[in-house]
Amino acid sequence: FTGILTAAGHSKSTFIATTTGLVLNLILDPVLIFVFNLRVIGAALATILAQIIVTLVFLYNAKNLDLFRNIRILSKPELNHISEILKIGFPSSVQSMLFTCISMYIARLISSFGAISVAVQKVGSQIESISWMAADGFSASINAFTSQNYGAKNYDRVKQGYKTGMLVVGLWGLLTTAVLIFLPGPIFSCFIHETNILPYGIDYLIILGYSQLFMCIEIATQGAFNGLGKTLPPSIVSIIFTSARIPMAILLSHYLGVNGVWWAISISSIIKGTILVIWFILYSKRRLIS
């Protein structure tokens, strides 16, 4: 739904749905984990309930749009469309599946440090999402702008659009980095007030704060690559360095405790953002010549 609606110019619908899920998750996480003492199960239930609500919001919006009214699900699809979709979508789908598997392992590792660490990661990641959700929106815009101008062979506009998008996303990444590093206590205490949990939350936000700029530019650059129809480079970078989180987390957590897991996530994001931006710059210099 997110991809279709954004490509069709209905980004407001996706914003409403994802924001609803984010806010609901922020509320349900501490309630189910601590008030009802469900711990890890509570974190899982919060995510499931939020996802259900997001899906319902998407379905409600979809039935009111002309885009979905004439769809015939049982009609025979055209083979050339299927092959093109697979060519573009397969790398990204593999990337998403592996990311989920890696995240499951990381979550298991985090749970070994206790319920407090699970709660910190759940709430902290929702706070951190102010960064990547905004970057996702700009990534969709860069994707659309890039694909339109690439198809029209306006390569100079492709480059200029990427530079402009990166400037905006970079400024947002710097802002979120500053906020998470210098104001972690006031932000985290808005959601969890227990004094024994707050120091862990502060550590999480500070450590992840260092990677926000790089995560934002990685997401934006992925949108540019996708707009060119080149989904393989972002997938390669993401698969390799997201997979690296597992050995890094195991090694660093041995010395730093759960903070080692946070550092593994943050360091991998910094590396991914740096490499993908360099890759796109080199690619555009070689291939996008007017």
Give the location of each predicted region.
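Alpha-helical transmembrane segments of polytopic integral membrane proteins
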Residues: 29, 59-62, 103, 107, ...
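Hydrophobic positions within alpha-helical transmembrane segments of bacterial inner-membrane proteins
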Residues: 22, 26, 30, 43, ...
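Short alpha-helical transmembrane segments in multi-pass integral membrane proteins
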Residues: 24, 35-90, 146-211, 252-290
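Short runs within selected transmembrane alpha-helices of multi-pass transporters and secretion channels
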Residues: 1-6, 14-25, 43-56, 136-139, ...
